[in-house]
Each structure stands twice: as structure tokens, then as C-alpha cells.
Amino acid sequence: MTADELRSLIASGLACDHIEVEGDGRHWSAVIVSAEFAGLRPVQRHQRVYRTLGARMHTDEVHALSMKTYTPAEWAAHPH
């Protein structure tokens, strides 16, 4: 799997304002900004992202995914 493929999978299941994905083909890190995260605890945000990936989380395609999740307001206030 490529970073673009992973980015597309996440975007297909979650309305995102911004997505950054980096990784080596199995171990990934992502920054995801979505209004859908409003009012959710961090673990709930991660669960929303995991749902977009479905069974791929249990294969070698996505062995590990580290996430930073933000609402648009949090992202605007975040130094980047």
C-alpha cells in the first residue's frame, strides 16, 4: 500500500479537511483533520479512522498506524 492509497481510504470514509500520511508501506503516521471529530475523545477519533480502514488494519498492508487527529478549529490553533 502507498501513502496515497491510505490517504484515499481514510478520505473515502471520513470527511476530512486535511490529511497527511507518511510511512514505509507497513508502519504509518497520519495527521487527520475532520469536523467529524468534534466532541469525540481521542480514542473515539481513532476508532472512526480505523473503521475507514476495515479489515486492512488486520493485514500486512497496515501493520501500525500512529495518528494525530484534530478538528478544524484545533488544527487552526496548532503550530504546523
Please report, for each region that a protein language model flagged, where it lies by residue.
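A short interface-forming secondary-structure element
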Residues: 32-46
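C-terminal structural segments of small proteins and small subunits
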Residues: 47, 51-80
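N-proximal, solvent-exposed amphipathic alpha-helical segments enriched in charged/polar residues
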Residues: 1-16
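Short active-site-proximal "capping" loops at secondary-structure junctions
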Residues: 26-28, 37, 72-73
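Short edge beta-strands and adjacent turn/loop segments
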Residues: 13-29
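Solvent-exposed beta-strand sheet faces enriched in polar/charged residues
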Residues: 22, 31-33, 68-70
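Short beta-turn/strand-loop junction motif enriched in small, turn-promoting residues
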Residues: 16, 37, 54-55
